[in-house]
Regions:
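Lipid interaction determinants
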Residues: 27-146
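Sec-dependent bacterial lipoprotein signal peptides
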Residues: 1-27
Length: 146
């Protein structure tokens, strides 16, 4: 009799675990590309706060055309992106080639690396997280209020 009770409890717990896992998987895949739309200001790179001297670093997503535009610190950048279920890849990138303050050039070099390594994206409220293939945070951006 006790064995039957234990087995029933185990079945309930197993069902509960399956439901939780399913809900977790569905919610992680539910991000819509439209959440990326608009201008995002770069706030941190590899958990280090970003402060530019001359121009604010930003990325602007045009989700209808699959294009991005932005400033990585000094230079303007244009390119395309693909998005599928939280996976994000930048491509066909082109940028101007100006020099600027050393601090801004360092931010720009870091952002070029971030864009190259980005494989996943997550939006949490007004914060966008760019992540590598393992889910490690590369950069965080805040939605512009303009």
């Amino acid at each position: 009799m006790k064995v039957m009770k234990v087995m029933k409890v185990m079945k309930v717990w197993n069902l509960f675990a399956v439901v939780l896992t399913t809900v977790g998987l569905l919610s992680s895949c539910s991000m819509d590309v439209k959440e990326l739309e608009g201008k995002w200001l770069v706030k941190s790179i590899e958990n280090e706060s970003v402060t530019t001297v001359e121009r604010e670093a930003f990325i602007e997503f045009n989700t209808v055309e699959g294009k991005i535009h932005g400033c990585l610190g000094v230079n303007l950048v244009n390119g395309s992106f693909t998005f599928d279920k939280g996976n994000l890849k930048f491509g066909n990138m082109g940028m101007t080639m100006m020099m600027g303050p050393a601090e801004d050039m360092e931010i720009e070099r870091s952002m070029i690396k971030v864009l190259d390594e980005t494989a996943k994206v997550k939006v949490n409220g007004t914060t966008l997280f760019l992540m590598d293939a393992s889910g490690n945070q590369l950069a965080s951006l805040e939605r512009a209020t303009e």
